[in-house]
Amino acid sequence: MGETRQAVAPSVRDACPLSPNHAGGQLRHFAPIIFGLSIIALWWVVADMGILPTYFLPHPRAVWDTLWSGIADGYLLSAARETLLAAGLGCLAATIIGLPLGYSIARSPIVAATLGPYLAASQAIPAVALAPLLVVWIGYGLVPITVLCTIIVMFPVVISTTLGIRELDQDIVDAARLDGAGRLDLVRSIELPLAAPAILAGIRTGFTLSVTGAVVGEMVMGGDGLGAALSRGQGSTANVAQLFAVIAILIILAVGIYLLLTYVEKITRKGLS
């Protein structure tokens, strides 16, 4: 009887809508929204009280007016599209290059020993230092910005692919080999699908970094994206409200991309379970 009670209790507790687990799960979905609204409310109070000068912290109403004006005339939307295009192309190129590279590092100790140190060293070079070199080598416009994004995203994609392949259950791989799976079939049907959650986590992190790389590239190499909008807001007469409006667009893009790729990752995990 005691054993039955112990077995039933957890299931009842999990199913109860008022249980701590259930309440915590519901709160987890709304926590980011509550936190964001709290920050905006605090910002509004500080601006209304005049604690900080407007050139340091503009009023949320001024930022909203600038943001809405930029969206209404299409300027900020067009800039966001340009930045997303460069970031997306860079992330795509990094994925195409990083997947086979990460797989090779995972499966070949020689490749890992040869390329590993250089991949780590590439992360020591800041994007601001690379951008002027790309201008000299390639020029201005979309292509050098895409190359910069590719370089930035490459490392997390390679590392996540390497870890995903190395952590596979070797018994599953050996069983597939015993069933007659060749190398290509093994990669396509077993290894990459099982490593997909780890790979998607790396791409999710990389895409967020890619947006940052696109903005830095646009500030240095020109263009019509959000980086150019930030540069214009930094002019001799700094438009702080415009800077905050562009930053708000960047935050929205980063959060949206993160949530979308997180959802894709969850769907992939459910499909594999």
Segments from the language model and where they lie:
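Loop-to-helix entry region at the N-terminal start of transmembrane alpha-helices
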Residues: 78-86, 136-157, 200, 242-249
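Periplasmic/extracellular loop-to-transmembrane helix junction in inner-membrane transport proteins
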Residues: 13-25, 49-92, 232
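C-terminal transmembrane helix and the adjacent membrane-cytosol boundary/short C-terminal tail
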Residues: 109, 166, 197, 201, ...
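Transmembrane alpha-helical segments of polytopic membrane transport and secretion proteins
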Residues: 1-35, 259-273
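Glycine-rich helix-loop "coupling/hinge" segments at transmembrane-helix boundaries
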Residues: 135-137, 212-250, 269-273
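Cytoplasmic-entry segments and transmembrane alpha-helices of multi-pass inner-membrane transporters
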Residues: 99-135, 159-166, 174
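Transmembrane alpha-helices
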Residues: 147-151, 184-216
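Short helix-to-coil transition segments within interhelical loops
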Residues: 165-171, 175-195, 224, 236
